[in-house]
Curated annotation (Swiss-Prot):
Belongs to the glycerol-1-phosphate dehydrogenase family. Its main location: cytoplasm. It comes from Hyperthermus butylicus (strain DSM 5456 / JCM 9403 / PLM1-5). Pfam families: Fe-ADH_2. Substrate binds at D122, D169, H253. Zn(2+) binds at D169, H249, H265. One of its GO terms (cellular component) is cytoplasm. Its EC number is 1.1.1.261. HAMAP family: G1P_dehydrogenase_A. It is found in: Cytoplasm. This is Glycerol-1-phosphate dehydrogenase [NAD(P)+]. Its cofactor is Zn(2+).
Amino acid sequence: MLHRIELPQKIVVGSGAIDALREVLEEFAGRNSSIAVISGPNVWRLYGERFRSIVEGFVEYSFFEARNASVEYAEKLLEDVKAYSPSLVVGFGGGKSIDLAKYVAYRLGVRMISVPTSPSHDGIASPFTSLKGLDKPHSVRTVTPAAIIADIDIIASAPIRLIRAGAGDLIAKLTAIRDWRLAHKLKGEYYGEYAAKLALLSAKHVIEYASQIGRGVKEAVRVLVEGLVSSGVAMCIAGSTRPASGSEHLFAHALDLIAPGKALHGEEVALGTIMMMYLHGGDWRHVRRTIRRLGLPVTAKELGLSDEVIVKALTMAHRIRPERYTILGESGLTWEAAERLARVTGVIG
């Protein structure tokens, strides 16, 4: 099996890392080049002036607003950016801005630089993009960021809920890897030990620093960011989202279909990890305690969802991506089995 691995070429992490932007742009775009900056209005209001002060007089740039992560908007944005003819695209903001930037860069065939301002999920370093309205409710392959600039001062000042959600996305690797191994054993699917161990290492660091991450301690946020980058790199190495996404993500995607916008991605997959760990016969209670220490919801009620929504999502999850084998099997869970699972793990009352 021929396996091509595309990795980020430069990663800058630390306090004041944003100041490395000019150096990174010189390396990947060149002086006096034209770049497109895709960012949300709030991020641009907070950090746009700083961005300008770093790049002004060095490169030409145009700002494009990341309004929503829908396919329809991504296509409109693509046409707007295409008219500007940039040599490089910068995603500056949260997951939405970075996903849109990866999609636009991929369609234009240019490089992309990821500059995250919040750590809500592991898309900051991965070659996969999640857009609403795709025929499949999961990530699709686009482009690997050529460089990642993660300023811990900026990221640690993000809302605590986003920080906790990022940790939830890493906790999910505990069941994602078990699902991947299962698919390898039962279906003969390719399994990459190195990518799997790299993703698991990210989860283990979150467990170790759970209390500090849950409080938003800057040093722990750095550990979280490095874990998110490592998870993205694991996906690059594997050539798929397998090291990062299993049955817990299928559950989260099902939730998004039933109750869109009710919870953050990391919150959903963390809740799913508790239940999927139970199905795997693992220490789900330890997972639940860790998620609680992170300050993440561990019940449907805390997530603002009804018991029925949780059970329905569990029964739907195996159909979200039928080609991806997980602990849910090919037939999935009956309503009774799903309800029992959610009750035993304390997700529903």
